[in-house]
Amino acid sequence: MPHDDHKGSRLSLLLFYFLAFLLLWEWLRPLDSFTETKHTGFFSVFIGLTFLLTFFRMRWFVTVPFCVIFTLISIHILFYQGSIFDLSWVSSFLQDVYLNITLIQSGQWNDMIPSFRTLLFFVLLWLLVYLLHYWVIYQRRILFFFLMTVAYITILDTFTPYDATFAVIRIVLIGFFMLGLLYLERIKLMERITLPKTSVLKWFLPLSVLVLAATGFGLAAPKSEPAWPDPVPFLKKITHQDRVSAGESKIGYGNHDESLGGPFQQDATPVFTWQGKERTYFRVETKDTYTGKGWIETDTGMSYQLSNGKVENLWFDHKVATERRTVRVKVDKHYGYNHLMYPIGAETIQPKQAVSLEMNGNTEQISPISEQAGEIRNMGNYTVTYNSPVYKLDELRKVKVRKNSEEYTFSDRYMQLPDSLPERVRTLAIKLTQDHDNMFDKVKAVEDYLGSNAFTYETENVTIPKNDEDYVDQFLFETKMGYCDNFSSAMVVLLRSAGIPARWVKGYTSGEYKEAGNKNGSIYEVTNNNAHSWVEVYFPEQGWVTFEPTKGFTNPAQFTSSDTKDSGSDSSSSPKKAKEKQKEEKKQPQKEEKQKEKREPAVSKKPSASHTNAGAGLYAALAVLAVLLVAAVLLYVFRSLWIPVFAVRKLKRRSDQHAFFEAYGALLKQLKRKGLPKRDSETLRDYAKRIDEKYDIEDMSKLTLSYERALYRNEDSSALWNDSRELWENLIKRRWS
C-alpha cells in the first residue's frame, strides 16, 4: 500500500515503523519462556523485513513472493534436512499442508504438525504487520494495540514463569513515545498544516523528558509490597481447582526442560505397553548442559540413519558382559510423539510400519527420518532387541577418576557446569567423594547421600527456584524435597563437580505389571505417571552405567561381584540382590514420576506430531484464538467490501420513517472508509457535488437533495426513501477508488 505525500516525512515514517516493530517484538520475546516455541529469531527477522518492505513502498508482486520465500526457507531450515534446492521437500510440505487443512476442517486442532503451525504463525505475523501499518500510518493511532500489549505482558508475568519487569518498562517507553508523536501527526493531518523541524523538535524534546522522567520516577520511587501478591490460588478456588497449586502441571513427557521445578498432577493416560522378560528403563533422550535452572542440549548434533534398524553400540565397551533381550512395544494410538522408547543397549529396532529411523548423535533420540516425521503420529508397534549389561563390580572399582577431562575419550560436555553454580555445591561434592579412591565408590557415595533420610520424595509441595537461585543448590541445601528431576539433576551436578563425567537421561520406567503374557514375557503398561529421569555415568573402558538416585526407585542395572558366577548371557547368573529388587518392583508399583509437560513448540529442530497430553487443551484454545484473530483482522481490513452488502440487506426492504436517515448515514461512513470523508467546512450539498464531480456522476447530489427534503422540510421520509433507494444502493455498492 503506497504512502500518500501527506502521510509524513520518510524519517518520521521510519521512526514509526521502528517503534511498531519493537512493540510487536515484545509479543515474541516471552514465547520461549512459557511455551516450547524455539527459534523465535526467525519470526523477529520476518516482521522486521516485512516492515522494511512496507517502508520502501514495495508493490505486492515484490512483497508477497519475498515473504513466501522467507517463510519456506525458514520452515526448511527448521524442519527438513538436505539441500533447499532439492524441491522434493516442497512436495512433502505441501502434502502436510493439505493434510492439516483437512484436520482443521474436521476440528482436530491437536493433530496439526509443528511445520504447519509455524506456517500459520508466519501468516498471523504478516497480518499483524499490515494491521500495525494501517493503524500507525493511516489511522495515526496505537492506543488499542499498546493496551493489548500491556495486558498481554502483565498476564504472562502473573500466570507464567516469564519475568516482565523490564518488558513493561520497554513497552511503556515505546508506547508513550508513539502516543505523543502520533497525536502530533493527527493534529497536522486534521489542520492540514506543515510544521518546521524546529516545531517538531519542540514537541519531541518535552515529550522525551516527560516520558523518561515519569519512567525514572516510577523505578526510583519506594514501593509497598503487593496487597494481592498471587491471585492464582484465589482464581483456582473460585473455579473449584484449588487443589492444584500455581505453577502445577500434569505429569508426562515434555520436549524441553529449561526450567524445572514446581508441583504436578497425576495423569494415568496410557503411553505404551510392552512385553519382555526383564524390567528395564525406556530411554527417550539425554541432555548434557545444565543451566542452573534445568537442562538443554547446546548442540543439536547430527542425526544418522539406522541401516535396517541397526543401532551403533554407543554405550558399552566390548569387555562388558551382556544378555540379549527382546521387548515388544505397542504405543497407545493417542500418544502424540513419534520418538521411540528403548532400553539402553539397543541393537536392532524393527518397526511394524514401513518407516526409516534416525538417531541423533548427541541426544540419542531415535525417531523417523525428517522426510517421514510429519506423516507419523507415533511409532505404533515395534520390536527392540537389546543387550542388557551385567557389570562386574571389581572391574568398575578399578576405574580411577581422571585428573582432567582431557583424559577422557569424549568432549568435556559431560563435565559442563554453569559459572553461576554456588561454590557450596562443589564443596559438598568433594566432601562426599574424598574418602574413596575409585570412581564407582565415589558415585555410590553420592547416590547413597541422596537416598538418605536427609531428603524426601515429594510431588506436591515442590518449589520453583527464583531468578537468583540455582535449581540444584535450592534442592540440596534449602528444600531437600522433590521428585526425580531434583534427585537426578543433583546427582549429575555433584558428580561433575567431583570430576566424574555424567549425563541426565529422561524417559519412562518399566511401568506396572498388567498380565502374564506368553513365552515372550510378561506384559506391562506404562502411563504418563511413569515418566522419569535418571543418571548415566561414564566409566572408561566400561561405558555408560545407569544409576538411580531418586528415593523409592530401583536401579534396573545388574551388578555382579567377583565371587558371583560370570553372568555372560545366562540370566540365571544375575545377582541375587538384583533379582530380589525386581520381585519387589512387581509387588510395589513404582512411585509416579514426571517430566513437566510444557506447551508444544511452534518450531523444533526435529518435528513430531502434536501430542494430546496436558497441553493439548491449551494448544486447541490457542489455535482457535489464532483463527479467530486472523478472521477478525481480515474482516476489519476488508470491511469496506462486506459492510455495504450487510447495509443493503438490512435497509433495502425497510420503509419506515427512519430508514432513509440510517441509510444516508451508512453511506457517509462507507465513503469515509474509502478515503472520501466529509470536511467540517462542507455542507451536505457541497460534499455531494464534490463526490459527483470527482467521479462524473449525479447520483450523490440527487440522493442528497431528497435527504435534505426529508431532513429540513419534514417531507415524508418513507416515500422519499422508496424513490431514492436505487440511487443509494448504487452508491454504497460502488467500488470507489
Swiss-Prot record:
Main location: membrane
Localization per Swiss-Prot or TrEMBL: Cell membrane
Domain of life where this protein originates: Bacteria
Cellular compartments per GO CC: plasma membrane
Entry keywords, A to Z: Cell membrane, Membrane, Transmembrane, Transmembrane helix
Transmembrane segments: 11-31, 36-56, 60-80, 118-138, 142-162, 164-184, 200-220, 618-638
Organism: Bacillus subtilis (strain 168)
Protein name per the record: Uncharacterized protein YebA
Recorded topology in the membrane: Multi-pass membrane protein
This protein's record includes keyword Membrane: yes
One Pfam family in the UniProt entry: DUF4129
Annotated stretches, region: Disordered: 556-611
Compositional bias of kind Basic and acidic residues: 581-603
